[in-house]
UniProtKB/Swiss-Prot annotation:
Compositionally biased region (Basic and acidic residues): 326-340
One Pfam family named in its UniProt record: DUF4657
Species of origin: Homo sapiens
PANTHER family assigned: SIMILAR TO 9930012K11RIK PROTEIN
Region (Disordered): 119-157, 216-298, 313-365
Name listed for the protein in its UniProt record: Uncharacterized protein C8orf58
Amino acid sequence: MMGRRRAFAVDGRDGAGEGLARGCIVPGVTSTYRRIPDAAHGCSSWERGDKFRGVGREALFLKLASRDSGVEMAVGDSPLAALPGLSQDSLDFESSGSSEPPAQVGRLLASQKLGEVLERSRRLPTAPTSLSGQHRSLRLASKPEREVPLGAGQQESMEADTDLEAGLEEEAVGGLGPGAWACLPGQGLRYLEHLCLVLEQMARLQQLYLQLRIQRPPGDPGEEESTRAPLPSPLHTPGNRGQGPWELLSQTEHTGAKAASPPKVEVPSANPPRLPETPVEPTYHLPSSQGHKRDISHWDKVKVLLNRICRRSHHHPEPPAPPDGSDPRIESRDLPERPQCRPHRKTFMPSLVVKKQRAKNLSVG
């Protein structure tokens, strides 16, 4: 027993069989065959110059026919007439009053139509792409848009949306600067690339810094002498004309004389025959870690030696002044020498000083 049946009138194209088909009950399964477009109708629409519309209608009707499940559906604005063979076939299926040859002819027509439907359904997957290409060419030529298949229209809209989004993204990325494009949200690979570039730049800066540290070590003696201020001498006054051992020590420190070379003993301009009693200790080129400690100990030794010289000068009796007082220059010359603690006049051999210094070098080494 059929699920649903519907009574409707079937009209032939030539008007024949009008009385037979009126008021008959036809099963709904035959509505599938009623929606198959006639080949002559499709050819006439193409001959009119509207190829695009004809292909669109065929695709639309095929889609409606595939959706049909036995219930008759609305066809739309383009009504199609029912085939007389189908109506006779349905009448023969229900009633036994029809003749056999028209039924065979109707079955042959139905089989032919089914073959055409199968061929068109095989061609259907390639149809939307070609139709979308034709539609794009027509749209570029500024022609009015007509009927478009449903599947092709959806595909075109999706492609247009994706193209529009890609174009907007390219414009947004291109409008930004070279450093801002890496900070876009969602751009994971670009962000990682930016981080790699930053790390490489930091590594290069660290390598340059290490090279500078190697080329210019921190224990540079010239740099330490420039940064370290000399200790002020309590016995040295700028107004004194006579220059004592303090100036000799400062000169040997600034010139940086080597330990192996003998020291240059400079004779003061005020008293040329006078020489310092204590030998001048040479400066040593020591490493940067022990240089400052050795300098402090060196100054302590110098202070101790100067104190001893002052004590010895106080213990020695002063030379008697001349009775006539004809040479006041000597007294005026001796007055500024007392606070400076000038040593008494003594003679010594320079070779002995060199030997003492060598002995000290050996003891230090």
